[in-house]
Amino acid sequence: MRHFRFLLALSAATLATPASAITFVNQISVSGSATDLATIGSGANFNRLGGFGSDLVYDSATNQFFGLTDRGPGGGLIDYAPRIQTFALNVNRSTGAIGSFTLNATTILRDGGGTAFSGLNPAFLNGNAANLGRSLDPEGLVRLSNGHYLVSDEYGPSVIEFDASGRQIRTFTTPANLIARRANGTPDYVAGRPDIVTGRQDNRGFEGLTLSADGRTAYAVLQDPLVNEGDQGDGRRSRNVRIVAFDVASGQSTAQYIYQLESRTVINAVVPTATFSATNQGRSIGVSSIHALSDGRLIVLERDNRGLGVDDPNARTPVGLKSAFVINLAGATNVANISLAGSSALPSGVAPVTKTAFLDIRAKLIAAGIAIPEKIEGLAFGPRLANGGISLILITDNDYSVTQTGAGAQFDVCTSGAGGITSQVALGGTCTAGQSLIDTRIFSFALSRDEALSLGFAAVPEPASWAMLIAGFGLTGFAMRRRNKALRTVAA
């Protein structure tokens, strides 16, 4: 077990809020220079505790969180071993505030033979862009009831089952229309447009993964539209993102649905001085996470590519979108056999999932005076609260605070924070005084009792209710004792 110092930032907000409110509570930061528990080497490419906010899962039985890394600090150019970080957060059950962060385990993801998967893209790892091999860029995580994991990946895009030790058990069958292919039909897991003409966009595969309440269906969501499904045959111009349903028992896909991203027109109204272009719609705006609710609805986390991160260490570009939405598949058209190529408009008779605003993260953080991170990617409901509400935990992917050139030369990104200064130093070097590596940030929100009930969470008696219930039992017991005593007296 390893404990880390963290920066605790409490908001001025309290939980004395109206029913159906969601309140930002506080944040903590895990140092960008912290190390994990892997024993395969030291340094940013081996054991730096970073990037583990690509997705987040909470297990109420063990009160632990599971964070997933992506392909590593090299952007597909470094042989990094993707992993799952198991950690604990001290969550105040009265307020929802998060405290100390404790790393409990680091699980390397390995193939069936025990060899670690690699973040290297297939061309570098296998010498062939058409051979996926052990290349893995994890982005979505599910923990099954037996302790196994389902992991979604961007390269394939793939869904893979691992046992509790991180060893591969099986790979689900990816629908053919999602696999990136060249004009001759050859798969290409590395290239982008115009080299690929069908399938997922490069680096825009399965970004989120979740499991239905009954454990039978897994839902994987692409980050953005397919490469050719948009006006002018360009997915970057479209809002239509595919959600894929998988039968967990067989590993086969059963349906595909359309989730529509927020319109850039609406987002541009929020950031009129730094607008998104037509080809930013389905490229710079996308889905980061998906979470199933007990009643069959899902929560989708959607964001733009702006905010404090390795590409903007001082958060100078205004953020347009960081929001969560509740969606419903009921009534949505199964588009598994429907092509949307060449158009951003849905065909007549095709209905997308319905979508309702749930949480404007951007607005909450601005109101709290907090710099908005670029990659808020993990979302999980945490412990229930004493008032019958529930905590909601969000986590960032800090990209290991590393940037690199196209040739693979890496540098640590140091910053003094939003509006400050930044510098790049040699990997593992020392940041200039007043600067530090970009931290992983974990945010806590509190949902009221009514909000929790509206999402399908079971009712939990509030402390006052428990007190009245216990008092009632006490009075009943007292009355019974008085009655028994009276009966004994009469009998005597």
Regions from the language model: what does each represent?
Residues 16-18:
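N-terminal signal peptide c-region/cleavage motif recognized by signal peptidases
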Residues 477-492:
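C-terminal membrane-anchoring or membrane-association module
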Residues 462-481:
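A short, hydrophobic C-terminal helix/tail in secreted or cell-surface proteins
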Residues 21-458:
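Sequence/structural signature of beta-propeller domains
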Residues 1-7:
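Bacterial N-terminal signal peptides that target proteins for export
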